[in-house]
């Protein structure tokens, strides 16, 4: 039971206003699904630009079933192999955008990730990518297959949060949504993996074996 004294019609209008404030159900909103690529680490043999693992291919198929039901206007992808293979499970008509790449990194001898791009640089290119998608597909739904740190850079920009303070990592094939209308930007969801079942989850967690 709602702890309010208003009538049902007032409550309904209030909830509609609340949803509109978050760009839910608003005409003209561009919705961007930021999707992390599927798993590529469980049976990895190529470290430079690995393909999807067997598990990753299964994850990509489950993602594809969900995305196809949503009917996106376009599918964008990073040029990295793991992102392209994830996108190809959805469609052969892929718009490759180098701004969706992962932040360049090395792995030190002790296993520490060392990024060679600043958070500011990653944020700027992801912001420009979002702006271009909105210009080209205004009012539509678009899917963009990217990478963990790049997606975080995009989301923290919208949330006005320091990337180093958001201790989250999107799971393989997870969907994080942005809603854009004019100069308004909202994060709708983060890390949605409703399309994955228990046997499709990577046993080593969101990072896989070594890196994002």
Predicted features, each with a name:
Residues 32, 132, 138-149:
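Generic beta-sheet signal
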Residues 40, 150-151:
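Short active-site segment of divalent metal-dependent hydrolases/proteases
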Residues 89, 153, 157:
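Active-site signature of alpha/beta-hydrolase-fold catalytic machinery across serine-
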Residues 48-54, 88-132, 188-190, 199-202, ...:
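Phosphate-handling substructures
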Residues 77-78, 124, 145-146:
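Short beta-strand scaffold positions
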Residues 1-94, 114, 128:
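Active-site-proximal alpha-helix that buttresses catalytic centers in soluble enzyme cores
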Residues 162-186, 196:
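Domain-level recognition of soluble alpha/beta enzyme cores
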Residues 71-75, 140-142, 163:
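Short active-site oxyanion
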